[in-house]
Amino acid sequence: MTKPTHPIYLDNAAATPVDPAVLEVMQKYFDQEYANPSALYGLGRQARAAIDDARATIANSLAAKPTEIVFTSCATESNNLAIQGVLRAHPGSHWVTTAIEHDSVLALEQPMSAAGHPLSVVPVSADGIVDAQDVAEAVTDTTVLVSVMLANNEIGTIQPLTEVAKRLVAIRASRTARGIDRPLYLHTDAAQAAAYINLHVNRLGVHLLTLNGSKMYGPKGAGVLYVRTGTIMNPLTYGGGQERGRRSGTENVPAIVGLGAAVKLAAAHRQAESARLEQLRGQLARQILEALPGTS
């Protein structure tokens, strides 16, 4: 093997660099069009238009409606808004997740249990895959939310999310037949998947979906929560009523614009990038096996 002459960064699952094209579109919102997007004068309307454009771009990438896109500060906030927001709107409700979720999901067990929302954690296989039937069997008549990440941030496993969604459809039908008037929502943390997997929400069968700019060559401090129309949930923050009342607080215009640009780039290059990474993964595996005999 040839010794590299410069550091090789291999932690893109933790944070990607900002793509130069993304940085370029963000720049003017720091020092030119910097007004509050809630303002009624010209600069404010320009900032609002930039947010609207980014919202439409992200909605299009998810095959969703612009009104279903909620901007947040990161995936952790999006996960918390999804889980706490739904549970707080349904007192005494139960929720289900898997043992391989991000800490921003699993760390909610104690505070949510203390608030009257018990959690069932479904184990995964030795390969890090959850069985969709195990998820379905963990659902009770008081379950209001199931949260299953799409791609894992540590080992990269992709969960059978559409299979989970199909089983939840059957459970909802059973509830309706038995006169149980309680929603059953499906949330997925797709922060690690956006650059590599088609995230059309109807195909996935989800009601809530988390995205994060810093995992797809966008800026840190930029997140999204997709919330399907009709989903009943409470906000975590109160104030000016931004994001249709879902998430109050002055919007981070440069970050939102950058996130929109990153999503657009990811959609355009997803197929080619996935093929490139697959080739690199194979090359790395072959070279390890050649350099370290007996490795498997």
PLM regions: where:
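Pyridoxal 5′-phosphate
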Residues: 1-296
